[in-house]
Amino acid sequence: MKHGTNGIVKFIFVLLGAVLFCVLGLAGFIFFHVSELKKAQPLEVSQEEKTAALKTFYSRHKINFDFPPLNSIENFLPVKSSSSNIAPSAKKIELPKIDAKSYILIHANTGTILAEYNADKIIPPASLTKLVTIYTMLQKPEFKDLEKIFFPPKEAWAIFLPKGAAWIGLGENQSLSIEELIRGMAVCSGNDAALAAALLTEGSLKKFTLKMNEAVKTMGLKSTRFEDSSGLSEKNQTTAREFALFSLHYLKQYPENLKKFHSVNEISYPQKHNILIKKNSDGLKEFQIKPATNTLLKKIEGCDGLKTGFIYESGFNISLTAQKNGERFIAVILGGQGKSFTEGIFKREQNSIKLMNFAFDNFKSFDIREHNKIKRSVSVLGSNLNVKTSAFIPLLADEDFSQDYLTVFKNDERHIEQVIILPDVIMAPLFAGQQIGRIEYRIKDSDIVLKTIPLICPHDIKEGSYFRKFIDGFYQFF
């Protein structure tokens, strides 16, 4: 009996030793596994993977990557800290008084709205339409050759325009380049040039306006539509917000047009090389000097565009841009009033000067490129990845115009703080483009968030085995 008891005790000790050995072995394995997991090097991301992840993110969040929206004014409250003793949120900035039915002011560097009034009110754009005409024409590959010569269609000759309509003087026995045609629209608002652009591009005004409407629809402009290419029709419609967004996209795509077309103070047409037969055409003389309709080119420092417009149904409109010290702003003012044409132009000038002075006096860009270099990796638990590469560095998925800059009040950089909201670990499965965190730029000691940049997973990461999930679960204990 004694020998039997000893045998059982011995067996139990052996069994316990074996169990202890297994437990210690498993613990050692888990410890080693978790140690490797914590030292995991992030997976490399190819350009193809990055592009695919961003496309997935934008698609799921219904964001137009090619034509992002403006930054909502709710994300940029009008606050100003003029003293280090005053919290930034304590002072409200005073907006300029603008005598118009509608306006909006944006920072072109970031797409941030700085001021607005009735910005969604639908108003005929008048000759601002010609900006969309220029854009639509340049979208067609054959019209990107600005030196291309053509003959103005008879339907677009100046003599057939309504009385009082602006023109450059297209007529018979003439030829001109695409560049001259665009300059005629941009500088002196030639309605004959706008009609010629439509006919040359699509063969008919109806087909061309369809292209115009397709272009603005692609940009997400829901209230903007066109019935003609010149802006003479009161049936054309837009809003200050949407036209500011269009103007910004136009400048992003064709920045060279500012110098080539929109900052030109005057043009002469027709010139000698435009006349095919050396005789006057329908009374048009050579070298007719036509000044720019944008009178702000000479009255606002740094002003280099864009376009003015007027019909009785709309009032005095302008899409204005100016740049100084690397800061560019865009203002769209619609429905300016005036008892006379001269008074209307004067008020438009005063409104424009007020908005641009307000912009340049108060706002600037804050470079956040260095801050946006995320070096912190996220460990992935319960995946099928090699333990040594079970981590990734998230991608920035900024749907705004620029993730490189932030619009701030002058001298307020010291009040800005960056907050990275990102988990240290995350469970598989994950898909490329999945948002897993964000960067926030805030005003210190306030609840004001100036900018949010989503952080997304760059890879498709599959779920691992039950055993992998089990041992990864010990991550938090080491």
Where are these regions (language model features)?
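N-terminal Sec-pathway targeting helices
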Residues: 2-20
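Alpha-helical transmembrane segments of integral membrane proteins
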Residues: 10-14, 179, 259
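Domain-terminus/edge residues, biased toward the C-terminal soluble/receptor-binding domains
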Residues: 29, 33, 221-222, 234-237, ...
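Intrinsically disordered, Ser/Thr-rich regulatory regions of eukaryotic membrane-trafficking proteins
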Residues: 19-22, 86
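Membrane-interface motif at the C-terminal end of an N-terminal transmembrane signal
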Residues: 23-40
